[in-house]
Amino acid sequence: MADTVRKKQKLVVVGAGPVGSLAALYAAARGDEVEIYELRGDLRDPSTVPLNFTKSINLALSERGITAMKHSNREDLVNNVLRDTIPMHGRMIHGRDRGKLWEAAQAYDVHGRAINAVDRSTLNNALLDELECTPNVKLFFNHKLTGADFNARKAWFERRVPGEAPLPNSANRVPEIEVDFDFMIGADGAHSAARYHMMKFARVDYQQEYIDTLWCEFRIPPTEDGDFRISPNHLHIWPGREFMFIALPSADKSFTCTLFAPAAHYKHLGSSPQNLVESFKDHFPGVCPELISPEDLQEQFTTNPHLPLISLKCKPHHYNSSIVIVGDAAHAVLPFYGQGLNAGLEDIRVLFECLDKHGSYNLDASPDARREARAKAFQAYTDQRCADTHAINDLSKQNYLEMRWGVKTPLYKLRKSVEEALDRYVPSLGWQTQYSRVSFSNQRYSDVIRSARWQGRILALGLATTLISTVGVIAYVFWKKPRQYSPLSLLRYSWRRLSSIWVTMFRTIAYA
């Protein structure tokens, strides 16, 4: 019995959000003694105030996140979470034309796949409930990480009693508890204390950026009959060149909405109630007063905080065999691809695949051998995830431009139509939209970028070839027989010629 206990590793997880909680489940399933330390109170308690003083932007759970949860081997957990989600099969673009409101659906996927709208607290509560039932897991809320020695494998936490200021001791220091560990997983968000202390030991390249966009949360209430006011199976977007309003469905039949706009625009909106209402009428037709009353709009804008958006990259994601950082602590991304949660959960799957592959859980190995194996696993994890998380960081920035305006442009619609047609009718090509690769597969993010660029080059080549050949044929026909063909017949001929060239080109690609 003593030998079994000796071989168990002790893991300290900093942060009890979805990513940290999933990491604890993975480790507990492998026999580790797990302790989770969370700065806030019990996140299942409605009175616990989020760190940003508001509900977060509604979460989108897609294939990567679902796959990561399934690999925890907690089938009931996955089923319970998915039961409380709402599938969104595409975007619903809203606008006004000549005084009339219109909406246009854009499916995410030609095969009918959907992403899932999920409330953060629903997901987090399910994970914490699962952890509380796991005997080799201990939860410590209201504990702040104040220091760490990653060579000695020790950490110090300050215990905070809610509503009370910590009292210093005789040495004028707030009392701390000392915790020993074999390794630590830092999952404590973009302003990570674990990352901060790791950077005292590791030479970390770090890049942080605040974009000139603030966000504020709004709510579209249910109808008087308790139903959704607009389609619940879409992500609703009111696009603008410099700003955007989106709405995601919630389980209580309301919609959680977010206004993204530059700081200067927020200042203009806050200068008078009239500016706010008029701006919504001009730029987000059909929202006010149809979905949100002017009074509620003003109250929510005034009451809810106007928060910044941060993105960050860093490398490496670990130090020796002592600590590894995951989720927003390693790679906070902008929310415009709905991949922040999914990338974080995928971190855990990849991390433990690396640990398993390198023998970190080989119980027959000595403690030194396991530490060496863990160091190699952490290095492999850093090598893989840095490339991929930097990629999704860049993709998320690009998708903001697409959502604000690109969804309305003819070029975006043309490329989407061509790529979806190829995916549907010539599946042997392996052709997919970039969005499908990101949201409905587990393909590495860095590979997604390479695939999308290759497809873009092929499409550009096809378009150029088609235009050049068509113009050449028309010029030849005019030169040879200027009176024989009417402009209409030439247009019809050009269309047939264009279609024939495209079909031939893609058949060639398919069988190359």
Swiss-Prot record:
Listed Pfam families: FAD_binding_3
Cofactor(s) required for function per UniProt: FAD
Associated pathway: Cofactor biosynthesis; NAD(+) biosynthesis; quinolinate from L-kynurenine: step 1/3
First-listed, main subcellular location of the protein, grouped into a coarse class: mitochondrion
UniProt keyword annotations, A-Z: FAD, Flavoprotein, Membrane, Mitochondrion, Mitochondrion outer membrane, Monooxygenase, NADP, Oxidoreductase, Pyridine nucleotide biosynthesis
Catalytic activity: L-kynurenine + NADPH + O2 + H(+) = 3-hydroxy-L-kynurenine + NADP(+) + H2O
Enzyme class: oxidoreductase
Function according to Swiss-Prot or TrEMBL: Catalyzes the hydroxylation of L-kynurenine (L-Kyn) to form 3-hydroxy-L-kynurenine (L-3OHKyn). Required for synthesis of quinolinic acid.
Similarity comment text for this entry: Belongs to the aromatic-ring hydroxylase family. KMO subfamily.
Protein name, per record: Kynurenine 3-monooxygenase
